[in-house]
Amino acid sequence: MNDQKVVLDKGPFFHGTKAALKLGELLEPQHMSNYQDKRSNHIYFTATLDAAKWGAELAASQAQERIYIVEPLGEFENDPNLTDKRFPGNPTRSYRSQSPLKVVAELASWERHSDDAINQMLASLAKLREQGTAAIED
């Protein structure tokens, strides 16, 4: 019998947000979603800097955009909102967990997407909301 656990990804892992967090702080589910008007049952994170940038840039707030390096403290799964959607598999290496993430560092500097790209993404998300198809599988 093989009791070896399959690890989806070894990281490093990132969480993009506009929340000011302290090192060692835990990110937990049941906070208001940045993308829906409800509490989220999961905490979302990624192993790609590009996806973390989108998380920070699209978060619902006027606060400073931040990207944290995080450590999952429990099991996690592929984010079903992105996995096998536009592309097969999980090329954005996006995950979600019902267990906390521990903040281990903050990226001091990173290059944002262009304002045009961010505005296009915001317009696309607004269109999905208008069409009623922006629901997140949570």
Q: Where are the regions that the model predicts?
A:
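ADP-ribose/NAD+-binding catalytic cleft of ART/PARP-like enzymes
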Residues: M1-I43, E57-L58, E65
